[in-house]
UniProtKB/Swiss-Prot annotation:
UniProt name for this protein: Large ribosomal subunit protein uL6
GO biological process terms, semicolon-separated: cytoplasmic translation
GO cellular component, one term: cytosolic large ribosomal subunit
Keywords: Ribonucleoprotein, Ribosomal protein, RNA-binding, rRNA-binding
UniProt source species: Methanosarcina mazei (strain ATCC BAA-159 / DSM 3647 / Goe1 / Go1 / JCM 11833 / OCM 88)
Record text on subunit structure and interactions: Part of the 50S ribosomal subunit.
Length: 176
């Protein structure tokens, strides 16, 4: 007895998807995203109004990959229709930080009184807005938005001071 392992993802209005060979493309009001999906024994089909991810057998690793592919496809579809956003707070008590966006980098100046600015990478087509003590990281690719926010948070990690006293830094406060 072979169990059917299939996941279906609904395609919302205003989003069009296509699959050519192993490259999945999603187009929506926010933009276009492409991603390659390939794993032995797993098929992805685009039907009317839905995407179906199915496995040839019911092995444990194929079942896991079906769930992984379904989650990635769902995130691509949500990204082009709604987008992803991550809010961060700039916290300082001892030395006021100057934060600004320069091209594909975020420059953090005067962190803990340091003379040399710290630089965090902005990945892909992610947009970063700085207003007062708040940073908003937004984009259509969930992985790029999350990694950009993590890059910013990591650049302000305190290593040579007591973190109970020096709580300066940039912290993620909300993911949406």
């Amino acid at each position: 007895m072979v169990k059917e392992i299939a996941r279906t993802i609904e395609i919302p209005e205003g989003v069009s998807v296509s699959l050519s060979q192993d490259v999945f493309t999603a187009k929506g009001p926010k933009g276009t995203v492409e991603r390659t999906f390939w794993y032995p024994g797993i098929k992805i089909e685009v039907r009317e109004g839905e995407v179906v991810v199915d496995a040839e057998s019911s092995r444990k690793e194929q079942k896991a990959m079906v769930g992984t592919f379904a989650s990635h496809l769902k995130n691509l579809i949500i990204g082009v229709s709604e987008g992803f956003e991550c809010k961060m707070n700039i916290v300082y008590a001892h030395f006021p930080m100057q934060v600004k966006v320069e091209g594909k980098t975020l420059v953090i100046g005067n962190f803990l009184g340091e003379k040399k600015p710290r630089i965090a990478k902005i990945l892909g087509e992610t947009k970063v807005k700085v207003s007062g003590n708040e940073i908003v990281v937004s984009g259509i690719n969930k992985e790029d938005v999350g990694q950009t926010a993590a890059n910013i948070e990591q650049k302000t990690k305190i290593k040579r001071f007591d973190p109970r006293i020096f709580q300066d830094g940039i912290y993620i406060v909300q993911k949406a």
